[in-house]
Amino acid sequence: MDLVIRTLDGNEAGRLKVSESIFGLVPREDILQRVVRWQLARHQQGTHHSQGRSDVSRTGAKMFKQKGTGRARHSSARAPQFRGGGKAHGPVVRSHAHDLPKKIRVLGLRLALSAKLKANDLIIVDELNVKEAKTKMLVSCFSKLGFKNALLVGGKEIDINFSRAASNIPNIDILPIQGINVYDILRRSKLVLSKAAVEALEERFK
């Protein structure tokens, strides 16, 4: 399939042939959900911790004698039913990361790209370069291209002036092609790929 290439000024700059196996798949929400969940789980802190009965600082002595008081039998004051006792089955420090097959991760990225194209939320530009790091100028360019909320993906290296100019614009994310991922694609309304990024994706998924 052929896609239109645009300049940052919004003008047409030719057409680019892209692979159906990358941009022409039927979106599957179940695969996208699995990949996003896998990504977020890897970044979840997991530093939560509550004190169990073995952690709280209380005496280990038996509270009162076993028989003769008429009360229920109790041993340790650290038991969870007592005030100041340990938490039963509380959270512990752990990693929330789980495995996901590489084939599913690769398929998820292809499906995310296809979903953006199917929804007319994919824009391809010739390059993500500007001569001066002027935020006002870049906002004007984005307006001509028709977006205020987008992920922009460049080649292996992002132009320093472009990065500086875009860094102060809300709801705009910039990534090199190595950092492209399903979560960042889906969390923004539009996906903007440079010609170099598309070529890198074609090479990657050969």
Curated annotation (Swiss-Prot):
Belongs to the universal ribosomal protein uL4 family. It holds the Pfam family Ribosomal_L4. This is Large ribosomal subunit protein uL4. Transmembrane segments: none annotated. One of its GO terms (molecular function) is rRNA binding. Residues 65-94 are annotated as: Disordered. HAMAP family: Ribosomal_uL4_B. GO terms for cellular component: ribonucleoprotein complex; ribosome. It comes from Bartonella quintana (strain Toulouse). One of the primary rRNA binding proteins, this protein initially binds near the 5'-end of the 23S rRNA. It is important during the early stages of 50S assembly. It makes multiple contacts with different domains of the 23S rRNA in the assembled 50S subunit and ribosome. Residues 65-76 have a biased composition (Basic residues). Keywords: Ribonucleoprotein, Ribosomal protein, RNA-binding, rRNA-binding. One of its GO terms (biological process) is translation. Part of the 50S ribosomal subunit. The gene is rplD.
